[in-house]
Each structure stands twice: as C-alpha cells, then as structure tokens.
C-alpha cells in the first residue's frame, strides 16, 4: 500500500456507520459529508470493507451497516481490507523495481532494507491489532 488516506478514511467511514446506523441511513453521500471525500471514493472503500466482511451495504439508498460488533473489528482488519494491492501485497514500504545492479548501492539496496522494513511493517500491524473500533468509539 502506498501511504495514502485509504486507511484513515476507512476508519472514519466505519466510525460513522457505528455512530449513526441506529438513527440514520448511512449512505455513501452521508459518509462523504462527514469525511469531506467524494462519494465515489467512499463507495470504493465500502466495497473493500464489504468484501472483507466488515460492513454490509444495500443497493441504492439502503445505506451501510456493520457486519460485526465494534469490539470485534480491529484497525488491522480495516488496514488489511483497504490496503491490499492487486498482487496481494499490503506493505507500507515498496521497493523501487529497477535499481542499478552494477552500482554498489543499487545492487544491494533491497537486501539492506528488507530486514528493517519488514520489522517496521510487523510493528505497524501489531499496533493496529491492539485497537478496536469500540476503543475509538469511546473517544468520540
């Protein structure tokens, strides 16, 4: 995953659904009003969250609801849902693909960076797994 806003917008989306779903139809337009994002982007994120089994969406203006309880959804679940690339990679850190193999730096850059970046990715995922949507709802 490239460093972008998908994760934070997805978390915002889920918090909106959890906060408002009892009293409102939480549509992509509704969520867009809270996030300040285009409804098309919200629908894309909702599609990924639905594919991951985190939310349910109803066609048209039916709105969205959570598929699980808020204490069963971690930030890692959300991260996995929205950050995975088409090739299955969800790493925050991606290598540039064509370093110069004849250069003493370029020929070893992947090897040199693999361990520390893998450790950082693991730490990120461990931290995200410690926080649930319920934890965040308590702070709203």
Annotate each language-model stretch with its function:
Residues 1-14:
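Short alpha-helical segments that sit at the start of domains
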Residues 13-22:
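Short amphipathic alpha-helical interface segments
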Residues 26-36:
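A short alpha-helical element within helix-turn-helix/winged-helix DNA-binding domains
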Residues 38-41:
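Short coil turns linking two alpha-helices in DNA-binding domains
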Residues 46-50:
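Basic amphipathic alpha-helical segments that dock to polyanions
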Residues 52-61, 65-67:
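Beta-hairpin "wing" of winged helix-turn-helix
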Residues 68-140:
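Non-DNA-binding regulatory cores of transcription-related proteins
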């Amino acid at each position: 995953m490239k460093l972008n806003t998908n994760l934070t917008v997805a978390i915002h989306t889920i918090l909106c659904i959890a906060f408002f779903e009892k009293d409102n139809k939480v549509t992509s337009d509704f969520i867009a009003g809270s996030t300040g994002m285009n409804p098309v982007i919200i629908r894309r994120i909702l599609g990924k969250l639905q594919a991951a089994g985190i939310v349910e969406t109803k066609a048209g203006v039916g709105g969205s609801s959570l598929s699980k309880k808020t204490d069963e959804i971690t930030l890692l679940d959300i991260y996995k849902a929205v950050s995975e690339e088409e090739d299955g990679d969800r790493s925050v850190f991606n290598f540039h693909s064509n370093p110069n193999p004849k250069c003493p730096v370029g020929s070893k850059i992947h090897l040199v960076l693999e361990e520390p970046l893998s450790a950082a990715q693991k730490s990120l995922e461990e931290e995200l797994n410690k926080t649930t949507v319920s934890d965040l709802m308590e702070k709203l």
